[in-house]
Amino acid sequence: MLYQLLHTVLSVTGVTLNAFMMYLALTKSPKIMRPCSAIITIKTFTDILTSAMSFFVMQRIVTDGSSILVIPTGPCTRLGPTACYVGHMFMLCFLECNLIWMISSYIFRYYILYVRDPSIKSLVFVALCLSIPSFIHMAAWIRSYDPNEAFVVPDSFGLASSHLILGGHIVYRSTITLILQLFITSVLVLIAYAWIRNTLLSFAIKMGSDKNDVKNLNARLVKVINFQVFLPTFIFLGFFIFAAMFGRYITVNIAQYLVSIAFMFSPICSPFSYILFVPHYLNVITGNKKPAENRATDMCAVRAFKNPNVSVTMTNA
């Protein structure tokens, strides 16, 4: 019961924070920030779906290396094992899509910096294209799942017979595959972070490090990505807990609760990277109206510094 309560609090918090961030991005972003608001909207949308699936399943993951069991305790249990397995797969898939979109957002920032602002339609199209492989992969696993497949529950897990338990060959292979994919994608996020951070610093040098506006802009951009790179650490934490259980380095008594909880903190913390470090959104929340010239260093105004004839004066949305 305590685990379900904790999962509910985390899921509701994740949905609420990301819905609020989506509201800010859609309704409070000035015109000059539209490309970035689209990027933020897509990111928060996947975070909302991740949190919703977490609530739907409220899963524990147990393994000793020879078997992997998923114990759902959420609303999906009323619909049966297939619904819970679908929810389990959707949650892991949305987490992966979230990480992939983080990498894509870094690439888009480079594109905005050195080429031009992409259209919102192109951003949505790219997001859909990036999601398709993950969903096809997930659909293949779901199609192969057999809720009637027999499997053995090790006595060492201490699971009651009254629990709804998902197990078997497909659960084993799909879970270990997707968790490994999450780990690999998180590593790619770190690589992309190092690249975009160096790009921002190089841009500041090219534009002249003696310009205060460029200094402030890049400092804020670096703060955003520094915060965002912290998000995959929760995926790493969940992965290493799972790996420790898998290798029998830790007992399952407490570890079985920690994998999903660790994963949940990534969508919960994500909105703060924008709320805390994008001045426009922070000013909207605090009701602080700063002069237009101080607001010109928002995230998507960066390209204007390449051309001194371009005005970056922004107005409230």
From Swiss-Prot:
Any one of the GO CC terms: membrane
Keyword Iron listed: no
Segments crossing the lipid bilayer: 5-25, 38-58, 83-103, 122-142, 176-196, 227-247, 258-278
Compartment(s) where it occurs, according to its Swiss-Prot or TrEMBL record: Membrane
One Pfam match: 7TM_GPCR_Srd
Main location: membrane
InterPro entries xrefs: 7TM_GPCR_serpentine_rcpt_Srd, Nematode_rcpt-like_delta
Superkingdom as given in the UniProt entry: Eukaryota
Family: Belongs to the nematode receptor-like protein srd family.
PANTHER family from the UniProt entry: SERPENTINE RECEPTOR, CLASS D (DELTA)-RELATED, SERPENTINE RECEPTOR, CLASS D DELTA
Protein name in UniProt: Serpentine receptor class delta-26
Species assigned in the record: Caenorhabditis elegans
Gene responsible for this protein: srd-26
